[in-house]
């Protein structure tokens, strides 16, 4: 019985540490690398455990960079007032503020989205998640 309890405890701890690593902001994103990216939405993926937005960003030379942004899960976006088919749609030009991936790829954890008309919606966790950094840029 003691051996079974010990093995169960080890398996539980192994699973817990893997879950915590998956949900660690600083494991994937750099709290010191804030980004503000403007582009055109190409796709909105409402999927658990995290929603994703994809943008085409036109560089000064005319080439296109593709960016992926992670956000709240769908149920949290809906509770924050998002509408699945109208809040963010392909073709919209937006500016997304967030934190860049540690590996330097065109991946970021989004915090807020600003639309062409100036209104802003929250797409990610509140202040402090970026390793205690300022969550929203000041205008």
Range-by-range predicted roles:
Residues 1-4:
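Positively charged n-region of N-terminal signal peptides that target proteins for export
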Residues 14-16:
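N-terminal signal peptide c-region/cleavage motif recognized by signal peptidases
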Residues 19-23:
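Boundary at the C-terminal end of the N-terminal hydrophobic targeting segment
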Residues 10-11, 30:
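Short, linear, compositionally biased motifs with a strong N-terminal bias
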Residues 26-139:
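PEST-like low-complexity, intrinsically disordered acidic/proline/serine-rich tracts
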Residues 7:
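N-terminal phosphate-binding loop and flanking beta/alpha elements of the actin-like ATPase fold
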